[in-house]
């Protein structure tokens, strides 16, 4: 929650999943302090409930990776030289790590904790790639945020990076506009990404991580929880928001 609150401040987002963001409703100052408070609360809960120093160490290192992923994304804003490898490293930190820790915590003190960590990591990768695809959705009432918000904010994700591989000479001059990019130029970016198959390639990549997660979930003991996790993972790939 803390990272999402801070992320909305950084991106100047007015909506998240169709709901008004904290910074939009109450201003950046309150939003930042709220995020800080949530971080403090998180570590207090860890101190109170962590069963071992090893568990506490894993959680704190996980948070470190999440924040480093966010910092890396900020550092690479409007970087037209962004590569797919850079993007995957970013989302491995800022999103996949969060899902991995969540799944690991649910399976802690069981023989499946390490497996759950890997499942969460793959789910997180698929989730973020799908989220980045939705930035190109034509109906922002479904996604809850403006279309092409990531591109406008200088965050170049899988669809753009795949398109750049095929249409570099067309796309690069537009990305190099940086913060000065116009709405007409954003529309050109959209057209290039769609025409070059950038969205299709990104969907295939999300599908790859989804299949990896499902394969690992199949190895868990059969139960209601296992079937529910499998269903959620499948539905996530086809979500509209």
Positions of predicted regions on the chain:
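All-alpha prenyltransferase/terpene-synthase fold signal
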Residues: 1-241
């Amino acid at each position: 929650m803390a990272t999402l609150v801070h992320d909305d401040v950084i991106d100047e987002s007015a909506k998240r999943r169709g709901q008004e963001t904290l910074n939009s409703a109450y201003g950046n100052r309150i939003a930042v302090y709220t995020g800080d408070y949530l971080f403090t609360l998180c570590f207090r809960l860890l101190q109170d409930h962590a069963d071992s120093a090893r568990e506490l160490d894993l959680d704190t290192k996980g948070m470190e990776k999440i924040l480093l992923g966010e910092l890396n994304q900020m550092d690479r804003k409007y970087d037209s030289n962004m590569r797919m490898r850079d993007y995957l490293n970013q989302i491995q930190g800022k999103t996949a790590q969060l899902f991995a820790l969540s799944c690991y915590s649910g399976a802690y003190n069981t023989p499946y904790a390490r497996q759950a960590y890997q499942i969460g990591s793959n789910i997180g990768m698929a989730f973020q790639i799908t989220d980045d695809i939705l930035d190109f959705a034509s109906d922002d009432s479904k996604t809850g945020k403006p279309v092409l918000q990531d591109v406008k904010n200088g965050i170049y994700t899988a669809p753009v990076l795949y398109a750049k591989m095929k249409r570099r000479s067309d796309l690069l001059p537009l990305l190099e506009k940086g913060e000065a990019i116009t709405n007409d130029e954003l529309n050109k970016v959209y057209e290039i990404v769609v025409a070059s198959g950038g969205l299709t390639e990104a969907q295939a990549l999300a599908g790859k991580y989804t299949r990896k997660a499902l394969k690992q979930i199949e190895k868990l003991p059969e139960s209601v929880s296992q079937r529910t996790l499998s269903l959620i993972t499948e539905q996530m790939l086809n979500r509209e928001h």
